[in-house]
A protein has these predicted regions:
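Core catalytic alpha/beta fold that binds nucleotide/phospho-ligands
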Residues: 1-108
């Protein structure tokens, strides 16, 4: 259950490998499994080119507005665990990935 002092946060979710939309939907589902994180709003899906490797597959992305009672470092660890569950491997910088979750903003 979220504590009364929950902080607003914005997460960017993206995928450029496999079934991109399904990867993002699974990541959203896994985020909601943590009782200390709640999704408030979700953007529409949008595409972006891979950077800096424009020849890599495009990214499908969303932005999530959420509330969390997790501290910033705990939130970071939590989203990295989700990336790993979805098959993300650190092969080289800016490599294509099944799931990428970035903390865009954390209300302190």
């Amino acid at each position: 259950m979220l504590e009364k002092l929950a902080k607003k946060t914005y997460l960017g979710l993206g995928s450029n490998l496999g079934n991109k939309k399904k990867n993002i939907e699974i990541a959203k589902f896994l985020l909601q499994q943590n009782s200390k994180f709640r999704i408030l709003k979700t953007s529409s899906f949008y595409k972006t080119k891979s950077y800096p490797n424009y020849k890599d597959p495009f990214f499908l992305n969303i932005v999530i507005e959420g509330e969390t009672s997790l501290k910033p470092l705990d939130l970071f660890v939590f989203v990295k665990e989700i990336e790993l569950k979805l098959g993300r491997k650190k092969t080289f910088k800016n490599a294509p990935r099944e799931c990428d979750i970035d903390i865009l903003d954390y209300d302190q």
